[in-house]
Design a protein with these regions (language model features):
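Conserved ABC ATPase "signature" region
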Residues: 37-52
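Conserved ABC ATPase signature
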Residues: 56-60, 64
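Hydrophobic anchor residue at the start of the ABC signature
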Residues: 70
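ABC-family nucleotide-binding domains
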Residues: 84, 91
Length: 132
């Protein structure tokens, strides 16, 4: 209806994870009813190769934790994905691989990226506008 806002998902600059939950449970927390655990686990394994999807957050490295947050944002329903410094803490290889997955899974949704690294914005290479 007119005036309604479409839902969006977000990766915050600071971690917003449920520490006592598994990586898989953190991803599923906002997924809609059409996302099953096996699909979420497959995305986690794509973004975080070798991850134990049942591992608690304290067992994961900072980069792994960051990619769990990105997986959650990509699985959440909505017309937009907001990423605030999403690649912080990722090494170059993980950053490149994660960027590719983000691009592959946007599926027509709007992406709003906040970053201090112009290379991140250029790597996503889908920008209509880049503001410095």
């Amino acid at each position: 209806a007119a005036g309604e806002c479409a839902p969006c998902s977000m990766v915050f600059q600071d971690a917003r994870l449920v520490e006592s939950a598994s990586a898989l449970d953190n991803v599923l927390v906002c997924a809609d009813a059409h996302v099953d655990a096996s699909s979420a686990a497959a995305l986690l394994r794509l973004l975080v190769p070798g991850v134990d999807v049942d591992a608690r957050m304290a067992e994961l490295s900072g980069g792994q934790r960051r990619r769990v947050e990105i997986a959650r944002a990509l699985l959440c329903p909505g017309g937009a994905v907001i990423l605030d410094e999403p690649f912080t803490g990722l090494d170059a290889a993980a950053r490149d691989a994660t960027t590719k997955v983000v691009l592959d899974l946007l599926d027509g949704r709007t992406l709003l990226l906040a970053t201090h690294d112009i290379a991140d914005a250029q790597a996503l290479d889908i920008s209509d506008i880049i503001t410095l």
